[in-house]
Amino acid sequence: MGGGERYNIPDPQSRNASKNQEQQNRQKSKDQNSSQTKIAHKKKERGHGYNPAAAAWQAMQNGGKTKSLSNNSNWNAGLSSPSLLFKSQASQNYAGAKFSEPPSPSVLPKPPSHWVHVSLNPSDKETMTFQLKTLLKVQV
């Protein structure tokens, strides 16, 4: 036979007791949170908190300009002529590959000798060349 399998059958009374405890704990945490938010609102009413509306109003009064950026002459000089930032980059030549032109065959590496069978008939070479060209054909 099975040999002592045990099943945990929950007691309905203990389940209700744990639910009551959870509800009481939730109620306590809600009470604590609401008292903390009330304190925070009172602090803001006294003028100790940060008021984003006041900061926005002050920014409108200043014409949307911040004082810290207007005092920094280096920052303004860089912004007044953005073409100076890219001038040195544009004068340099790009040394990378040009993808508009295919590379010449002399530049391409040779395949290893064991890849290509040495004794090929000329017709086999032509067939292989045709197949390779069709495989490598790039559609524009």
Swiss-Prot record:
Disruption of the gene: reported phenotype: Mice are lean, resistant to high fat diet-induced obesity but without the induction of insulin resistance and have a higher metabolic rate than wild-type mice.
Pfam family, any one: PNRC
Polar residues composition-biased segments: 11-38, 59-81
GO cellular component terms listed in the entry, alphabetical order: Golgi apparatus; nucleoplasm; nucleus; P-body
Record key words, sorted: Activator, Cytoplasm, Nonsense-mediated mRNA decay, Nucleus, Transcription, Transcription regulation
Keyword Coiled coil: no
Keyword hit for Translocase: no
Expression sites by tissue: Strong expression is detected in lung, spleen, ovary, thymus, and colon.
Location of the protein in the cell: Nucleus; Cytoplasm, P-body
Motif (SH3-binding): 100-106
Domain notes: The interaction between PNRC2 and nuclear receptors is dependent on the SH3 binding motif.
Function, in words: Involved in nonsense-mediated mRNA decay (NMD) by acting as a bridge between the mRNA decapping complex and the NMD machinery. May act by targeting the NMD machinery to the P-body and recruiting the decapping machinery to aberrant mRNAs. Required for UPF1/RENT1 localization to the P-body. Plays a role in glucocorticoid receptor-mediated mRNA degradation by interacting with the glucocorticoid receptor NR3C1 in a ligand-dependent manner when it is bound to the 5' UTR of target mRNAs and recruiting the RNA helicase UPF1 and the mRNA-decapping enzyme DCP1A, leading to RNA decay.
Family, similarity comment: Belongs to the PNRC family. PNRC2 subfamily.
UniProt subunit comment: Interacts with UPF1/RENT1; preferentially interacts with hyperphosphorylated form. Interacts with DCP1A. Interacts with many nuclear receptors including ESR1, ESRRA, ESRRG, NR3C1/GR, NR5A1, PGR, TR, RAR and RXR.
Protein name: Proline-rich nuclear receptor coactivator 2
Organism: Mus musculus (Mouse)
